[in-house]
Amino acid sequence: MNVFWFLPTHGDGHFLGTSQGARPVSLPYLKQVAQAADSLGYHGVLIPTGRSCEDSWVVASALAPLTERLRFLVAIRPGIVSPTVSARMAATLDRLSGGRLLINVVTGGDPDENRGDGIHLGHAERYEVTDEFLRVWRRVLQGEAVDFHGKHIHVENAKALYPPLQRPYPPLYFGGSSEAAHELAGEQVDVYLTWGEPLPAVAAKIADVRQRAARHGRTVKFGIRLHVIVRETAEEAWRAADRLIEHISDETIAAAQQSFARFDSEGQRRMAALHGGRRDRLEIQPNLWAGVGLVRGGAGTALVGDPRQVAERIGEYAELGIDSFIFSGYPHLEEAYRFAELVFPLLPEPYASLAGRGLTNLTGPFGEMIANDVLPARAGA
């Protein structure tokens, strides 16, 4: 199992839908979140992409020298940058980070943003571009000089003279809920990602992608993207969930849902359908809450509960075949610690062993010394 955290390059705070309790995006703050995730033992961090975020490649380049083990899941956008240039960027960042780069392939689901970025293609055509892009990108990073003449991409003698540290290339992560996305995942990517839908829906996605991968003689791993609200008791967790959205007005929800309605993303449509823009139908399965999606695009669901409940729900997704979990919580600095302290002890290794110690304090006392010479008692001792 690989547990990731999230870098809030689009802003952070205690509440959704308001500037109250908000924090600006800054390098010092992102450094705090990244170094916390690094020292706590998270496998990596997802860096979001799009016009509402700081650029993910620049952020990863700034933070890689400030961390030691943390991996960075960074987006590539087929159609915006050529596959050859993108491959060289990936090779460089992978080398300079010591092999800590992971690639998130994003086709883009907002037609308005796509047009602003110079992409005037429909849903099906964007997946054609992504397919051709990855065919070139993968071969270039494997050291080939590539000639490719596709419907959308045409390159001659495309090459990267400096190889990536990870071979054959940094692992490819990719999410999408349409048939075209599943076919692409089955043929070309290493890890298929889904947003946090109910268990039956996730199981169906996994089965479909597995079947498509098998037809290509491949196997694919699976990951899920979720928010998390965990507290010592379930009652505290649900109160925290209510507080997270207490400042959101009905007008704000309506405006957000209207914006999401223009998307041609099947995944975004499925996220919106989980709550229907209503506050009174947010727990969509035990401990799975759709409140974040009232105003946030993309991942819109959270695991809510006490540590045992959250760990049990994680275990249920793991039983389906999920082995990469990408979590986030508001505010991201505090919640990175809270999740590690409360849930890591209940997860498989290496996380259970990291709990209560962290990667930077494996042998020393954990907690404040008592009366100048007494070690703090270990919980459960």
UniProtKB/Swiss-Prot annotation:
Leader sequence segment: none
Biological process terms from the Gene Ontology for this record are: alkanesulfonate catabolic process
- Tell me what turns on expression of this protein: Repressed by sulfate, cysteine, or thiocyanate.
One family name in Pfam for this protein: Bac_luciferase
- The main enzyme category here is oxidoreductase
EC identifiers of the protein: 1.14.14.5
Against InterPro entries, the record matches this protein to: Alkanesulphonate_mOase_FMN-dep, Luciferase-like_dom, Luciferase-like_sf, SsuD_RutA_monooxygenase
Query: Which GO molecular function terms does the record list?
Result: alkanesulfonate monooxygenase activity
Q: Tell me what reaction this enzyme catalyses.
A: an alkanesulfonate + FMNH2 + O2 = an aldehyde + FMN + sulfite + H2O + 2 H(+)
Additional notes on this entry: FMNH(2) which is absolutely required for this enzymatic reaction, is provided by MsuE.
Q: Which PANTHER family match?
A: ALKANESULFONATE MONOOXYGENASE (PTHR42847), ALKANESULFONATE MONOOXYGENASE-RELATED (PTHR42847:SF4)
Family named by the database record: Belongs to the SsuD family.
Q: Which NCBIfam families match?
A: alk_sulf_monoox, PRK00719.1
Main role? Catalyzes the desulfonation of aliphatic sulfonates. Shows highest activity with methanesulfonate.
Q: What is this protein called?
A: Methanesulfonate monooxygenase
Its taxonomic placement starts with:
Bacteria, Pseudomonadati, Pseudomonadota, Gammaproteobacteria, Pseudomonadales
